[in-house]
């Protein structure tokens, strides 16, 4: 069993090595630190595997170790060659050597880092010891992964068979594809070997978050404090142990927004490119990811529209490039989905009369009840939502006058869309809220904590 665990980890590390080379090629000016490259390599590695498998499916090639590894090895050699060629002409910049690690470590820093380590350790322990047992982990993501492995490809007949009502053929396939990739290289199905994906995603989320805060000029202690706030949220940690896709989409969306927010503040085009790639991968992960792509795009358009008129044409060109990048990431999935004529359950069942009827309006009472039940659930969320409400009420004007308004816009748009689903759902709304709302909140938890950190930074700079 231990060997299977280690093999599963090594199989997931391999595409991360390839992604590291890809990041080195992108980072031609040596801007990123090692601490930033590590989570990016992991996240891009998963995305590259899913993207490659979708392309193989469209080309009619079977999923086998040979077909899976050959393109990855070829791309790895290509990226390495480009990187080595550039390295001879570039001098290393000081910031690329992670100067943050050389700072003095105070007792508070060590305490916070220990706390973060304990929370992550709990996530790894729980994820790796418990089997896949939660409903969607077994009947949706895990079932699709096993079907892909057994069929040596994505089985259209299985996905579109209405008898398998829990499958949701229209759901993006990043997670099932990555799980099946592990199965293919292992040579058999092993649910424990793929469970590395989830605590590693939480680790990547926290690391990318901390690195983003340091880029915003927060000192180490403050950065670690907010990273600890993020990783100490019980339901976020739980989502990294139950084999659901929510921790993945939270990480992709969160990291994509972090780099978009850094671009707004610093105007480094590398950050905008990273944001576009990560945002596109969020769209490959869950259906909600398509909306999250739109959220980041709206934030970018608003930021560009605020620029001086002389800079605005260049800004709109960057918007078009941003759309082009995340559309390239999404294209194989969109083409495949179109080819199998999959329909979204909610859109397919949506009727105008359902939206305008009085019963729909009366759902507000049920929705508000379940919202407050989550927001006051300190056991699952600590004081996160109450603190967020307090911050919004007491700093409303300052939020609108600073870059924090972009965080508020992204959070408000995401919550508004998710709320609209409960108004139009054809399921019993109370049941739907009980089974999904807590998971949807996970998606923008990193943005809320980023709002706290940004408010603290603005206050500290004024003082």
Where do the protein language model's features map onto the residues?
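Transmembrane-helix signature of polytopic, membrane-embedded enzymes
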Residues: 31-40, 189-192, 209-232
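Hydrophobic, aromatic-rich transmembrane alpha-helices
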Residues: 180, 204-213, 373-408, 412, ...
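Transmembrane-helix motifs of polytopic, lipid-linked glycan transferases
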Residues: 75-85, 193-216, 255
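Membrane-lumen/periplasm interface segments of specific transmembrane helices
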Residues: 130, 298, 302-306, 315-397, ...
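Membrane-interface alpha helices of multi-pass inner-membrane proteins
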Residues: 226-228, 259-260, 264, 271-287, ...
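Membrane-interface helix-loop-helix junctions at transmembrane boundaries of multi-pass membrane enzymes
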Residues: 102-107, 214-222, 267-269, 306-320, ...
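Start-transfer (signal-anchor) and selected internal transmembrane alpha helices
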Residues: 63-123, 321, 395-409, 461-463
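Membrane-embedded, hydrophobic transmembrane alpha-helices
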Residues: 1-100
């Amino acid at each position: 069993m231990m060997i299977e665990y280690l093999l599963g980890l090594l199989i997931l590390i391999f595409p991360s090595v390839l992604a590291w080379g890809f990041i080195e090629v992108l980072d031609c000016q040596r801007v990123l630190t090692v601490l930033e490259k590590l989570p990016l390599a992991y996240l891009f590695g998963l995305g590259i595997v899913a993207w490659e498998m979708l392309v193989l499916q469209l080309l009619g090639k079977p999923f086998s170790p040979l077909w899976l590894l050959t393109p990855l090895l070829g791309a790895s050699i290509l990226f390495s060659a480009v990187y080595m060629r550039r390295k001879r002409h570039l001098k290393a910049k000081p910031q690329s050597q992670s100067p943050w690690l050389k700072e003095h470590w105070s007792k508070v820093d060590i305490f916070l880092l220990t706390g973060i380590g304990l929370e992550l350790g709990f996530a790894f322990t729980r994820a790796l010891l418990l089997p896949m047992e939660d409903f969607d982990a077994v009947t949706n993501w895990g079932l699709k992964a096993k079907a892909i492995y057994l069929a040596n490809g994505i089985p259209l007949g299985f996905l579109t068979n209405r008898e398998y009502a829990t499958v949701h053929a229209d759901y993006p396939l990043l997670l099932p594809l990555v799980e099946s990739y592990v199965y293919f290289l292992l040579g058999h199905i092993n649910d424990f070997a793929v469970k590395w994906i989830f605590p590693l995603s939480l680790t990547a989320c926290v690391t990318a978050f901390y690195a983003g805060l340091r880029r915003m000029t927060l000192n180490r202690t403050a950065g670690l404090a907010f990273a600890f706030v993020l990783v100490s949220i019980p339901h976020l940690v739980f989502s990294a142990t139950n084999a659901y896709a929510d921790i993945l989409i939270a990480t992709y969306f969160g990291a994509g927004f972090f780099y978009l927010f850094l671009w707004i503040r610093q105007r480094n085009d590398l950050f905008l490119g990273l944001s576009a790639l990560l945002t596109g991968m969020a769209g490959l992960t869950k259906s909600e990811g398509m909306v999250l792509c739109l959220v980041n795009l709206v934030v970018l358009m608003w930021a560009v529209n605020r620029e001086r008129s002389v800079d605005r044409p260049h800004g709109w060109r960057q918007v078009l490039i941003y759309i082009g990048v995340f559309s390239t990431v999404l294209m194989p999935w969109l083409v495949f989905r179109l080819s199998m004529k999959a329909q979204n359950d909610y859109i397919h069942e949506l009727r105008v009369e359902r939206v305008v009827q009085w019963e729909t309006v009366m759902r507000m009472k049920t929705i508000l009840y379940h919202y407050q039940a989550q927001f006051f659930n300190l056991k699952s969320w600590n004081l996160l939502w109450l603190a967020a409400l307090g911050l919004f009420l007491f700093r409303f004007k300052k939020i609108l006058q600073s870059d924090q308004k972009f965080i508020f816009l992204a959070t408000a748009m995401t919550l508004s869309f998710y709320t609209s689903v409960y108004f139009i759902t054809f399921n019993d709304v109370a049941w739907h809220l009980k089974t999904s709302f807590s998971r949807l909140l996970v998606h923008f938890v990193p943005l809320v904590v980023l709002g706290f950190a940004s408010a603290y930074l603005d206050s500290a700079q004024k003082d």
